[in-house]
Regions:
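Cell-envelope/extracellular polymer assembly enzymes that use nucleotide-activated donors
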Residues: 3-5, 34, 188
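Short, well-formed alpha-helical segments that are part of the catalytic scaffolds
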Residues: 13-26
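A conserved acidic beta->alpha catalytic loop
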Residues: 23, 39-48, 69-70
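Short beta-strand/loop segment that forms part of the nucleotide-sugar
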Residues: 32-41, 62-67, 92
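Glycine-rich, basic loop-to-helix element that forms the pyrophosphate-binding segment
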Residues: 66-82
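Donor-binding/catalytic cores of nucleotide-activated saccharide
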Residues: 71-75, 92-203, 208-226
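Short aromatic/hydrophobic "clamp" motif used to bind/position activated sugar donors
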Residues: 87
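Membrane-interface aromatic/basic loop that binds lipid-linked glycans or pyrophosphate carriers
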Residues: 113, 273-344
Length: 344
């Protein structure tokens, strides 16, 4: 049995796919890994490239061709077909750091944890800058119990798709079924399997290279505004999923998942309260969503009051949504004058 399945979701990436696959297909690990290249209805030469790699590396590369269903659909296929003990997603325009990846696979052969967490790096190719992200207070090689760990050690950072490798049986046991034809589904991947993760190991290895080829590529607010219906669909799914399972979670898992959801909800409120230029729509949408959240999960609703701008908007029925190019700090100053007190 292979120790690791690496899923490579593939959609119109003929320019980058070879770099991605070449970083994985190293002589030292060929017999230990499975590479699932799942083509999601590409219109360019991506499928032909992946087929050629399958022919060249028949014991390692498995090519799957399917109709377009979005990023989530490729993960669904990958989890179903994976033969490796562990499972990792590597987007086809990203790559791995060769030296640390070899060490990573070597360590995995002896690993028993439900999940393995590593570091990653954002490569801003458009300006040549590189950002390194690590979990500074976790110990290299140490196994932690998620139900017992002091979550303060994470400093508010959660485990992302780029940093996380799950045991395949844990993914399947969680019942994870990613939404299809929907953006931002990585949040499902970050949350749902955690319900079945009791132990995780941390490797201080610089594995994942997250490619940012354009200044506007990263998940900035303009993209969120443009795709806000996708974001709303995803967040409502997460809220309803969590509401259905929270009573069965340990206190630590509740706190950890709520930490992720608070971050995600913070982004969602920011889209409407600060960045959407269609102010009438933003006003109506955020009031409707806020009422939905209060009705669906009072605990999450109350938790958001720790954010000053959400609290002030609620107290004024969202009359302080950003208007006509004004900066948010000006809105906050006005809110403070009206309310007669300062935000904490």
């Amino acid at each position: 049995m292979k120790v690791l399945t690496v899923l490579v979701p593939t959609y119109n990436v003929e320019k980058y796919l070879r770099r991605c696959l070449d970083s994985l297909l190293l002589p030292e690990v060929l017999e230990e890994i499975e590479v699932l290249a799942v083509n999601d209805g590409s219109k360019d030469g991506s499928a032909d490239i992946a087929r050629a790699y399958e022919k060249k590396y028949p014991q390692t590369v498995v090519f799957v061709d399917k109709e377009n269903g979005g990023h989530g659909s490729t993960i669904n296929v990958g989890i179903e077909k994976a033969q490796g003990t562990y499972f990792k997603v590597l987007d086809s325009d990203d790559w791995v750091n060769i030296g640390d990846f070899i060490e990573f696979v070597k360590r995995l052969k002896e690993e028993t944890a439900d999940a393995v967490i590593c570091d990653y790096r954002k490569e801003h190719v458009y300006n040549g800058k590189s950002e390194y992200f690590e979990y500074k207070d976790l110990e290299d090689g140490k196994k932690y119990n998620l139900n017992e760990i002091d979550l303060n050690i994470l400093h508010g950072e959660y485990f992302m798709m780029a940093t996380t490798t799950y045991r395949t049986e844990v993914l399947r046991a969680s019942g994870l079924k990613m939404l299809e034809k929907t953006f931002y589904v990585d949040m499902q991947y970050n949350i749902v399997p955690i319900t079945k993760v009791d132990t995780f190991a941390y490797y201080h290895l610089d594995i994942y290279r997250y490619f940012i080829g354009r200044k506007d590529q990263s998940m900035n607010m303009d993209n969120f505004v443009r795709n806000q219906e996708h974001n709303k669909r995803m967040i409502k799914w997460l809220i309803e999923y969590y509401t259905g399972i929270e009573k069965d979670l340990t206190p630590n898992k509740m706190e950890y998942i709520e930490m992720i959801l608070t971050y995600t909800l913070n982004t969602h409120y920011s889209i409407y309260c600060e960045y959407d230029k269609d102010h009438k729509r933003a006003y109506n949408e955020i009031r409707e969503f806020d009422a939905y959240l209060k009705k669906t999960n009072q605990r999450l609703y109350d938790r958001l009051n720790c954010m000053a701008y959400v609290r002030y908007n609620r107290e004024t029925q969202f009359k302080f949504v950003k208007v006509d190019g004004s900066k948010w700090h000006k809105v906050m100053v006005l809110a403070r004058k009206v309310k007669g007190r300062f935000a904490r």
